[in-house]
Amino acid sequence: YSLTSDDVQAFREDGYIHLAGVLPDAVLEYYEPIISKITQEHDPAAGVALEDKDLYGKAFIQLGNLWQHNAQVKELVFCKRLARLASELIGTASVRLYHDQSLYKEPSGGITPWHVDQQYWPMDSSKSVTAWIPLQSTPVEMGPLCFGRGSHLKYIARDVKISDESERIITQAIKKEKIIEIQEPYALGDVSFHSGWTLHRAGGNTTEQARKAHTVIYMDEQMRLKETRSQNQENDRISWCGDTADGAVINGPLTPILYRAD
């Protein structure tokens, strides 16, 4: 799969790109039941009814570092094609894994509020990108991602965790800044990439099927750990960065290099 110069320019201007047909249907049809089984088995809220969950729980079931649970999922997470695309989009010679996660929005699941990802990550540069990989065709009614075009350049709500508050603050900022919201259906095989500072959300899932998605977060091979500024960043440092010292390259066993240009 090859990116054009227009693709790269669009990503850097818009903060996201939705690419069609990145992965074959058969590949996703193979991995979907494996990822679904692991997600269900390790769901921290298993047995809790949707109506009894908080805002975050109603938005999706979340499980991180699936690649450590299953060798087959590791193959997908370590996919050179996706890692190369990530590297080319953010303009680095190589990328590391930050982590992967499954995000399953249950039938009748709630919205995912507006937020930015990188406020959770103790990284010292903006050279990060997330691949969002739906595991089924995803119509708008199922709650695919919605992006604020160009919002990664706006410095909006960068210290606000995902919440009712982030939804309110960012909704107001989008109107004030006249940011265009882009929400599109995804065909099976489509993959989108978004910057760590791109504003995004997802609508509720009004269908009777779960919206199943897998994500892989990539960062520059030379990404350094910055001093944490919040409990969320401290949690991430503990979870993913091991004994990396502040200011050092995040190069522990959980953050392997996934692609390096020849």
Each language-model region and where it sits:
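Double-stranded beta-helix
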Residues: 9, 138-201, 223
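Short, surface-exposed loop/helix-turn segments at secondary-structure junctions
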Residues: 116-117, 164-178, 208-210, 229-235
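Short, solvent-exposed loop/turn segments at secondary-structure junctions
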Residues: 24-25, 102-104, 109, 119, ...
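Active-site region of the double-stranded beta-helix
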Residues: 92-93, 118, 123, 134-144, ...
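Non-heme Fe(II)-dependent double-stranded beta-helix
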Residues: 1-14, 20-114, 120-122, 159-160, ...
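A short beta-loop-beta micro-motif enriched in histidine and acidic residues
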Residues: 90, 116-128, 179-180, 186, ...
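Non-heme Fe(II)/2-oxoglutarate
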Residues: 38-41, 45, 159-160, 191-193, ...
